[in-house]
C-alpha cells in the first residue's frame, strides 16, 4: 500500500474581490465518508452562496467526484479536482465555501479562485506519502548520538522513537528496498561500532516537500 494524501484535516480562508472563499480539506477513505463531510460543511455553512466540492478515494484513485453547487458548469469542482490530481493525492475531500461579495469573477476568475483555494490549502496543510517501510533499531553511545544527526540529514531520514538509558536506542524506518543499503551505511558511518536490529514493517507517513 502506497499513496499520497494530505498531512491532516484543515482549512484556509482568503478574500478575492470581496468574495470570501474557505477551503475545507479532510482525509476520507470511502465515497460515503466524503459525502458525509460535504453534507456537514453544507449544513455548517448553509448561508453560503456555494459549497463546491471534489474528492478522490481509493489507493489507486478509483473514485473521483466533483460538484459545482450552482456555479457555472466546469468552473469549480473540476478545477478543484485538477489540483488534487496534479499533486497525485487520493483519499481526500475538499469543499470550497464561497460567500459572494457582490463582484462577479467571470468563468476564468472562478476557475482561478476555486483551484487557487485548494492549492493554497494543500500547501498550508502539507502532503504525506503513506507507505510500508522497514524498521531498523539502532543502539549507540551518547557520543555517537551527537554525530547521528549528521547521518539522518545526509540520508534524509527521521528518527521516530528514541529511548535514553545507559545508551541510546532509536528506530528509523526506510523504504524496504533500501533497508540493507541503509544498514551498511550506518555500519560504515559508525566504523562498525553500532548494533542494528530489524524491526519488521509498519505503515508510516513520510512528509512530501513541495518545491
What are these regions, as identified by a protein language model?
Residues 76-124:
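Active-site beta-strand/loop microenvironment that shapes enzyme catalytic pockets
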Residues 126-143:
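Short glycine-/aliphatic-rich beta-strand segments at the starts of folded cytosolic domains
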Residues 45-48, 155-160, 187-195:
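A common structural junction motif
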Residues 34-37, 114, 148-151, 182-185:
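Hydrophobic side chains in well-ordered alpha-helices
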Residues 139-157:
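Short amphipathic alpha-helix segments
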Residues 42, 84-85, 115, 119-126, ...:
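Signal for well-folded cores of large energy- and translation-related assemblies
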Residues 1-74, 179, 195-206, 211:
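C-terminal regulatory domains involved in ligand/effector binding and gene-expression control
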Residues 172-178:
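Terminal, non-globular segments
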Amino acid at each position: 500500500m502506497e499513496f499520497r494524501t494530505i498531512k491532516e484535516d484543515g482549512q484556509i480562508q482568503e478574500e478575492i474581490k470581496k468574495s470570501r472563499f474557505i477551503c475545507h480539506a479532510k482525509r476520507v477513505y470511502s465515497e460515503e465518508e466524503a459525502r458525509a463531510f460535504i453534507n456537514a460543511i453544507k449544513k455548517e455553512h448553509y448561508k453560503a452562496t456555494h459549497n463546491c466540492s471534489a474528492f478522490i478515494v481509493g489507493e489507486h484513485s478509483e473514485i473521483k467526484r466533483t460538484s459545482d453547487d450552482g456555479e457555472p458548469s466546469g468552473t469549480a469542482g473540476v478545477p478543484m479536482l485538477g489540483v488534487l490530481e496534479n499533486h497525485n493525492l487520493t483519499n481526500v475531500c475538499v469543499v470550497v465555501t464561497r460567500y459572494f461579495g457582490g463582484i462577479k469573477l467571470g468563468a476564468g476568475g472562478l476557475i482561478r479562485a476555486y483551484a487557487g483555494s485548494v492549492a493554497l490549502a494543500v500547501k498550508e496543510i502539507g502532503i504525506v506519502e503513506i507507505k510500508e517501510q522497514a524498521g531498523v533499531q539502532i543502539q549507540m553511545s551518547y557520543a555517537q548520538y551527537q554525530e547521528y544527526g549528521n547521518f539522518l540529514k545526509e540520508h534524509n531520514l527521521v528518527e521516530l522513537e528514541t529511548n535514553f538509558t545507559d545508551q541510546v536506542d532509536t528506530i528509523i524506518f526506510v523504504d524496504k528496498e533500501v533497508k540493507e543499503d541503509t544498514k551498511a551505511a550506518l555500519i560504515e558511518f559508525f566504523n562498525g561500532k553500532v548494533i542494528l536490529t530489524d524491526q519488521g514493517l509498519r505503515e508510516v507517513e513520510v512528509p512530501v516537500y513541495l518545491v
